[in-house]
Each structure stands twice: as structure tokens, then as C-alpha cells.
Amino acid sequence: MGLPEVNFLRKNCILVELKLFYQTVYPPKELYWNNRITAELSTFSNIKYARPTFAVNNGTFQRTRPKLDLVLASSDIRKLATVLFNLKALIMNTKGEEPTLTTMTSVQTNEEKNDNLEQKYSSLLDRWNGKVEVHDSPFLQLQRDSNLLFAERPVRYVSTTEGEGVDISSEEFFRLEEEQCRRNYDVLVDEHSTPSVGMKDGQYGPNIIHFEPSLYHTYSSLPMSMKFWLNGLEDDETTMMNIDEKSAENLDILLHGFKGFSNKRVKG
């Protein structure tokens, strides 16, 4: 990974581990919901990398913590960080909605994504500053028809995947450090579907996926597949906001034109 890539990552990208918590022991239709989540995220950010870990490995009885490893880009990384790390949940199917695999019919322009990000950021600030009436709920729903739920109070410190806390407003937050740090790679868990405190109560009941985002803050903490992807990027004259399709296909880890994950893992 050359200097242009490093500079781009520090100025425009957030590398995040998004843990998913379902209220069922065996989460239903994980592939569908991973597609839904990335579709929601892509409305206000550019998804450069997305790789899921499913709760139940295909062909085995081994259970793991379901998550998404993501590289999200934006021209305003500070606003993206505020929106992303205050994102707490996704409302699942409403009554009558068929959980079928779908793809986005159109790809939003960067200008549209920036507008959506600005709208979410401004709405959150208005809620947190008391300019908009907040109802009695553990979450903020910025619009009635929105599936995204946010923190009732702003997050000040973000947890890294190595268990450290980083001030979301600091310059340090946006640096991908090089030093070696220890990381727990044991992802086998018994409580992968256990929601956070307060998740079981409230108006949404079990019809919700809870998010727990953690920041990848050092190169040594990155998953091997993400390292391969970063090292596979080539220096060229084009901006990294438009990553070469062939590189993505060779690595088989980027979203293919924002159409979602491969259909190889449909059972669930």
C-alpha cells in the first residue's frame, strides 16, 4: 500500500467492524439482511469494501459472531464518523414485507450521498441539542419511514477492535496507525445473538437488528482479507473514490457495483 492510498484512507475513509445482534439464536436470512444493511449505508457513504461473517458457517455447526467488515468513504469524514458511530439499529421487516433478495435499482451520485449525510448529521445535532422534540425511546428515528435508529445521546468515545477508546472528535481518530497491537481473534461465542441492555424492551420488540461498531485503528488489527484488499490496490492517476473493477473482482471482496453480496450463502 503506497503513500497515495494511505493518505486517501486517512482523509476519506473509516475502517469499521460492525457487529450484528439478532434476537434469535439462529438469525434468519442473513444474506438478505446484510444486503439491506449495506444498501442503507450506501445512501450516505461510498462503500469501498464489505465482507460479512455469518452467525453459522456454511456446512458446519460452528457459530461465530455475525458482523460486517467495512471500508466507508466520504468527502466529509467527520460527519460520516458521527452518523456511523451513533447508528444503533435497523428495523427489520414490517408486516407484509417479503424478505426476498433485492438489489438497488439505481446508484446514487456522490452529491446525493453527501446531501443524505448532511441531512442525517444536521438532524442528529438538532435532536441532541433539543431543537426537536424527542419521544420516550432508547433510540432516535430521524424520519417516520426510516429503518435506521440512532443513539439518544451523542457518542463521545469510540471503541477500537483492540479494546481502546478513541475520542471521535480528535485527529488521532482518523489515523490508521502502523504499530503492532494484540488483538483477540477468538470470535467463537455463545451470546452472539444477545442484544445490548434495553434491546429487549421498547416499541420495536424483536423486529430489530442491533449494531455495535468498532474502529479498526491500526494496520495490525485489520482482518487478513482487508489487508489483502488494501495491498492489492494499485497506484494510478484515477482517484480511489472509483476503485478499479478488476482489482475488486480478483480479490472477490468488494460489493459488485453496490448490488450486494454473492448469492452463494442463501440458506439461513
From Swiss-Prot:
Which keywords accompany this UniProt record?
Mitochondrion, mRNA processing, mRNA splicing
- Gene Ontology biological process terms, A to Z: Group I intron splicing; mitochondrial mRNA processing
Domain of life per record: Eukaryota
Keyword Mitochondrion present in the record's keywords: the answer is yes
- Give me the Gene Ontology terms describing cellular component: mitochondrion
Question: Where's it found, cell-wise?
Answer: Mitochondrion
Role description? Involved in splicing of intron aI5-beta of the mitochondrial COX1 transcript.
Name the family the entry cites.
To baculovirus occlusion-derived virus envelope protein E27 (ODV-E27).
Q: What else is known?
A: Present with 861 molecules/cell in log phase SD medium.
Q: What is this protein called?
A: Protein MSS18
What species does this protein belong to? Answer: Saccharomyces cerevisiae (strain ATCC 204508 / S288c) (Baker's yeast)
